[in-house]
Every structure is written in C-alpha cells, then in structure tokens.
Amino acid sequence: MGRTRRRNSGTLSNVTTDGLAPPAIESVSGELVGYSLPELPAHLVYPLDVFADAFTREIERGRKAASHIHAHVVGLARDCDRALVNNLAAMDSLRTMFGEMTLHIEENDSRDRTKEILADYSSSRPWATVNCKDLGRIHRGSEFAGQRTVELAEYRTACQASVPDGADLVIVFDFDAKGGFSPVGVAHGIHLLAAERHCACVASVSLIRSRVAQWDGTTTTMLDQWIHYDAWALRLNSWFDDYRAGMGSWKHQWIPPVGSPFVPVCSAFGGMAIYRAGAYRAGRYTGEDCEHVKFHQTLPGRIYLNPSMRVVMDW
C-alpha cells in the first residue's frame, strides 16, 4: 500500500504503513507473475486510533534497533512459485531495514518453477543460500500431526544449521504465503524484542479468506470472511491441543487489532516469527504435535503473539 489512509468513522488511524505482497521483480520471475493481493478490510491492516500514537513510536524504535542488527531469515518452500516471486522481492526490500541480513531457504520435491526461481535468486545474491532436494516425498498438505510434521521438523532443523555465528535475530517465514507479510509488523516485533529482555519469540497473526457461517437469529448465511489462519500452532495458556480435540476452532474468529498489546502465549507462529538467535539455536523441532509447538516447548524465554505482525496466507 505505502500510502496514508483516510480516517474511517474516527476508528482507524491514518498511520502510513508499508504494504503486503510487493510487486514481482523481473530478475527473479522472468515471465512468471506473482499473486495480486485483494483489498483487505482497513481494520485488518491499520491500527485503531486508540493505538495509533504508540504504534508509530514503536515502529520507529524497531526500525532504529534493526539498523544495528544482523537478521538471518530462514524458511521452507515447496511448489509455491507464484508466492515465491513476491516474497523474494519482499526479502530484497526487507534487507534495507537491517544493518545486515542473510537468508536461507530449504526446498524439496517441487514440480513447478520453485527450484528454478530459488537458483536464479541466490545466484545473484551472495547473502542468500538455498538447499534444494529431491526426496521423492508426497505433499501432505491436509495432514495434522504425523509424517507431515515429522518431515517439517526435519526441514526446520536444517534451517537451524544455517544460522551464522554473528546473527542477532532469526526470522522464520513460510514462503508459500500468497499475500506476503507486513514490513511494518517486522519492525514492530523487533521493538518488542529490544524492549523485553525475557522475550525469545514474537509471532504473527496469519489471515486467510474463507467461507464462514453467519447466524442472524433466524437463518444461516455463508459469507466470505477473513479469519485467523494458524489456529493449530496457537496455544494460549497451556500446551493442550484444543484444536484437534474439537475445541479450538474459535481461534479462527479471534483477530486482535493491529497496534493492540502483545499477547503472552505458550506457542504461536502465524507464517512468520522472530526469534533471538540464541533461543532459536537452543530449540528442538520434533513432529509429535505441530512442529512449532514442540519447538516452543524447548525454547528458553517468553513467547508473544504480536497483533501488528500480519501474514496473508491465502484467499
């Protein structure tokens, strides 16, 4: 977006924010065109007036801190070429926020142009590395805990090995997010890590547009609605897997406003999380549950959900 928004009935601030999903860049994509992010409701992007002044101050503090930081970005990519086009362009932009930024991506078994895009991108950027493998594994997209999470834990452990000695922070990002992430949210998350010395991780609110039943007292109507996506990794005040127990679907409806206070949690991810490098190295991924949950159980330090960190997964 990169623009100043007009006030809407006095509820939303006119804070200028950076947009999600920057345009695709020709040097990465060739003729491949990335996704065009649909218009998001303003309340999902901009802070309410009550949070606006503090939000602006915290972003600037985060940017100032980031300018002295070495951030290492890691992530997974498989069969996500169009999302990858936008997200790699976003990495080029994000890199300007930091004193230094490096990048490593683990890929396996892609059948689209993902491998080609990664190879082209890393060949012209010495600060970026990729590890592409053909393991002959099927894509287990709809599975919960099981072989899928065992394999994801394996790939994420490989990402841990890529962290350079000089890194201060590690940003874990899922490169298949079709709508990308908010750079302002990253700055806001860095503010929290700089301000709270016991904080080991800040996680995002991820969004997806889905058909949702709405009840008006007499009839049920199915409507398109933006909801909170990563409910399984989100464990609020215990490690109990309420989602697979049939008690956690309410979390899809919980989207705390941008600029609102950080929420202490046992676990959260949301497509992007920022870790202190030492804490990230110390954690251990396993696959008996959501791999992020198992990792966070071994993490030294506190974990917060940051309502100002936004990732758009799909629509």
Question: Residues of each region from the PLM?
Answer:
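C-terminal catalytic/acceptor-binding lobe
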Residues: N14, G19-L37, W250-W315
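A conserved acidic beta->alpha catalytic loop
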Residues: C80-D81, E106-I117, L135-R137, F175-A177
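Short, acidic, metal-binding catalytic loop of nucleotide-sugar glycosyltransferases
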Residues: A90-E100
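Short beta-strand-to-loop acidic/aromatic patch adjacent to the donor-nucleotide binding site
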Residues: G166-G180
